[in-house]
Amino acid sequence: MCGIVGFIGEQDAKEILLKGLEKLEYRGYDSAGIAVQAENGVVVYKEKGRIAKLREIVDENVAASVGIGHTRWATHGVPSKVNAHPHQSTSKRFTLVHNGVIENYELVKKEYLQDVTFVSETDTEVIVQLMEQQVSTGLSVEEAFRNTLSLLHGSYAIGLLDAENPNMIYVAKNKSPLLVGVGDNFNVVASDAMAMLQVTDQFIELMDKEIVIVTKESITIKNLQGETIERAPFTAELDASDIEKGTYPHFMLKEIDEQPLVIRNIIQKYQDENGEIELNQDIRNAILDSDRIYIIACGTSYHAGLVGKQFIEKFAKMPVEVHVASEFSYNMPLLTERPFFIYISQSGETADSRAVLVQTNEMGHKALTITNVPGSTLSREADYTLPLYAGPEIAVASTKAYTAQLAVLSILAADIAKAKGEVLDFDLTHELGLVANAMIELCDQKEEMDALAKQFLATTRNCFFIGRSVDFYVGLEGALKLKEISYIQAEGFAGGELKHGTIALIENGTPVIALATQEHVNLGIRGNVKEVVARGANPCIISMKGLEMEGDSFVLPTVHEALAPLVAVIPLQLISYYAALHRECDVDKPRNLAKSVTVE
């Protein structure tokens, strides 16, 4: 959700900034802009829409080796050129980009900036105007920056240019991700490392309420008290090819195809030298010392948590609750005496989940983060981390991170079960290997998936997914994928709930996708299909081999029933992908959505 880049050195800043913003497109945005320190002052370029439009207006003849850039996802003010970043103070001395939400911006305007004429509707403009007001009182730029930040309540990642000090960038963060990259006679700023892999793989993590002064030769980190902090850089373990589509038309299709490799990678990472599942002893002990597990997540990660609940309760016989993070923060349930929290987040930056983690940390409860970004905020602030090892996921709609979450949750459940003396009736590592094989088989059946999408979804306005037991949870994820990228109104329901209201929406031709992978509820879901067919529905039944019946639309290769969700979701991902193509939707960057949701 939004992205920041900055560059200071001797090279052409404009092109580096534009390329950096292109690498941040996956985070979601509705407008973009850059500002560069040119010979005659700061020059700002910004546009509503795609970065390609921004490129068209950037003057190639303007020489600049210092600049900042931004992709905006609207929170305050409509998507527009005026509301796009960078924003400038009235005198144009200060130019600023900002990710996050300033919660008290209206109070700041009223108390400090009554005489200022604002150009935009954004909370961000308040910061840059406040900066100018603070300098006007006689403070140095650094003192004014520190004072400005002390008056703000909320989240921010900030890059600031000062026209009177053109050889530096001022940077600060609080509750919003930001890195500083280290180069040879240059330095960079970025919301995440992928943006600046083009020039460096050395980055320094910034902590909340730190101020950084960046020049081409130095990086000076200070706290709000002005004390200097030393911190060594880390090497970003990313390959530039990981964030390229290669021969694929879309990142989403590439990431769907990468899932078998991801599962095998997870097996390898979580095996000991004897090929046995082995997790950190401290994680195991903390969970065993608890009396209930609480899984906190949003969106796709929440759906993974629902399946994870099944894994843990069935394998390890421990009670689990799953909560939507945004609801948990404001309506915390009664907790048991010894709760253990699991936070699931692809990015590790999800603001709603972090808000809960802050609360539970203050209460003294242990927490584990399951994330694709081990150095992320959630990872740093939780007690333990289990990485997904899925590699960068660029498409906004999550695919490989979801199945990676399921695989890691199954491994966690099996490890706890083993520690408790619970015996599984199958070898998890072997069965996960079979899951990877089944995924390969499914990914090779794209023509069949395309045909199903064309038959059931190409022209429909709505669609329902039904399932029982764990298939219900997979159906929720299938519905989310479809609505995210094809803009079809799609909903997932428990099969048994149809007659309690939803069946009123069924009419002639309504597509209903039914999942049948669980033997103990197979007859039940078949009965639900008959109910909707009797009302005119157009059923698409996806069943597991051995449970199939005449008329099923697609039969999945056999895997262990407990791990069926990892396989059953693949056709749903592919059907959603092809439905979006048939409807000429932007698959990788669907409207109004952001990959990393860093504001509450």
From Swiss-Prot:
Report the residue ranges that make up the Glutamine amidotransferase type-2 domain in this protein. Answer: 2-217
Some GO term, biological process aspect, for this entry: which one?
A: UDP-N-acetylglucosamine metabolic process
Q: Which residues cross the membrane?
A: none
| Enzyme Commission number(s) from the entry | 2.6.1.16
Enzyme class, spelled out = transferase
**Which Cys pairs does UniProt list as disulfide-bonded?**
none
Q: Which GO terms describe its cellular component?
A: cytosol
Q: Which UniProt keywords apply?
A: Aminotransferase, Cytoplasm, Glutamine amidotransferase, Repeat, Transferase
Domain SIS residues, every copy = 283-422, 452-590
Q: What GO MF terms are annotated?
A: carbohydrate derivative binding; glutamine-fructose-6-phosphate transaminase (isomerizing) activity
HAMAP family in the record, alphabetically?
A: GlmS
Oligomer status and interactors: Homodimer.
Query: What protein does this entry describe?
Result: Glutamine--fructose-6-phosphate aminotransferase [isomerizing]
Organism name: Bacillus cereus (strain ATCC 14579 / DSM 31 / CCUG 7414 / JCM 2152 / NBRC 15305 / NCIMB 9373 / NCTC 2599 / NRRL B-3711)
Upper lineage ranks?
A: Bacteria, Bacillati, Bacillota, Bacilli, Bacillales
Q: What is the primary gene name for this protein?
A: glmS
